[in-house]
Amino acid sequence: MEQFGNFYITTPIYYVNDKPHIGHAYTSLLCDVVARFMRLAGKNVKFTTGTDEHGQKIEKAAKARGMQPKEFTDEVSVSFRELAKSMNFQYDDFIRTTEERHEKAVIALWNRLEERGQIYLDSYSGWYSVRDEAFYQESELIDGKAPTGAEVQWIKEESYFFRLSNWQNKLLELYENQPNFIFPESRKNEVVSFVRSGLTDLSISRTSFNWGIKVPGNDKHVIYVWIDALTNYLTSVGFPGTEGEEYKRFWANDSSSNVHVIGKDILRFHAVYWPAILLAADLPLPKQIAVHGWWLSEGEKISKSLGNVIDPIGLAQEFGVDQLRYFLLREASFGQDGNFSKKNMISRINSELANNIGNLVQRTISFLHKQCSGIVPTVDQSLLKGEESLPNCKAILDKAMDHLSKYEFNQIILLIINISSEANAYIDKSAPWMLSKTDRERMNLVIYKLLEYIRVIGILLQPIVPKSAEMILDQLQIPKEQRDLKSLCNACISLGITLPKPTPVFLRVETKEEK
């Protein structure tokens, strides 16, 4: 991921046929963490999410509930806002595809494609999955089902088509000239293989249902839900207006980064169809499609039939919002599948958050109060060298931002854990409780260095566990304006100030054995 001054990051808009699950929470969390890091780095950030509310699947789900589609989507869309609130996601815009601004954007994009001869009317016959809202070729079916396991049905109807086949070579050029356009590389290779195998024109309208945006000039047709959904990335920056400030700043700007973060199940729509549509409409492309894996539950695929669907809101209430955020980022490597286990989650909370970081904060500030009445001691800065050197903030920050550029969230966390472990080992080695009797000047030095360790940890933790990091920095009395990444290297804890008595930041989770 490139890190320009303007930074636009998006989740896919979520399909509202059911309640939010752990996959939705994870995608949004990744975007939220990146957005928070970028804000701390002084970037101009826009983070968007939303709900995809049109299509046959929604129409069926609403009918099953005895509701009108709009009434149904109004209800379920709220649950995705509640997820964002419960997980402390700081988005800047929430797009609903039923909004008027979005319909205008979709129609404008359709018209651009039509004006450029990229759309034609014909008839379609083939396999279609209502669950996936996707068309599949015969060769893609596995045991009569979609590659995702979804049921498919044979449909034949009049349809508008997008000339996708015209853009095969341009797409291959894009992937070659911009090697990081699809990340990680394994997903890029998957897409390149698919495109090289040959592209056929894409059916982009349906006549067998009514719930959607009508094709301009032919309201018998509804625009294909994925054309509708993908356009949200333009809607949020003010399209169809191409002269607006947000469009110019976040989309049509070589010195901006715009990243779509998605799950691997919707890779083809974002990495093949979307750039082809934008190229055909003569519109700028996103800079990157970042693709994460799925979550498994105790090693098994999550599904309603297995009864192992994971409710993120329930988990946040049970263990804490920051604890859940931490675990999801710590446990999974970006691009690979993660395995959810309550046992592992409790282990991470207790060993890394409570026993390591939480213990460091508690024991350091408690000792400060016991020996110095809570006053940060004045130290001779010339003594902070060699083994007594302060943490190398620049090297730490460079590592963290390098990991961020590759979405290595678990490596950022490991970096922080290592800093905390180093600080705890320093306490044991320095034995400040002994120095209090023999060398108080050195004791003061040890305390000051430990407080600096904690300051660095607190600043780096802000995007990951925002509330807990705020508690840490508040206990150090770090001014709000000194909590950004620039201040990580350019500021330090104030001498002579009195810190409040410590408040536990991370509590242990009692295990069954302990109970």
Where in the sequence are the language-model features?
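N-terminal Rossmann-like or analogous alpha/beta NTP/dinucleotide-binding catalytic cores
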Residues: 2-121
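Structured secondary-structure scaffolds
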Residues: 2-49, 101-105, 148, 152-370, ...
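Amphipathic alpha-helix face/heptad-repeat signature
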Residues: 349, 353-356, 360, 385, ...
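Short secondary-structure capping/junction motifs at helix and strand boundaries
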Residues: 87-96, 114-127, 139-140, 154-155, ...
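A non-catalytic, amphipathic alpha-helix used as a structural packing/dimerization or gating element
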Residues: 33, 71-82, 356-363, 395, ...
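Cys/His-rich short segments
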Residues: 116-168, 172
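Active-site-proximal binding-pocket segments
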Residues: 267, 328-331, 335, 344, ...
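Basic, alpha-helical terminal appendages of large translation-related enzymes
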Residues: 1-6, 46-50, 101, 122-127, ...
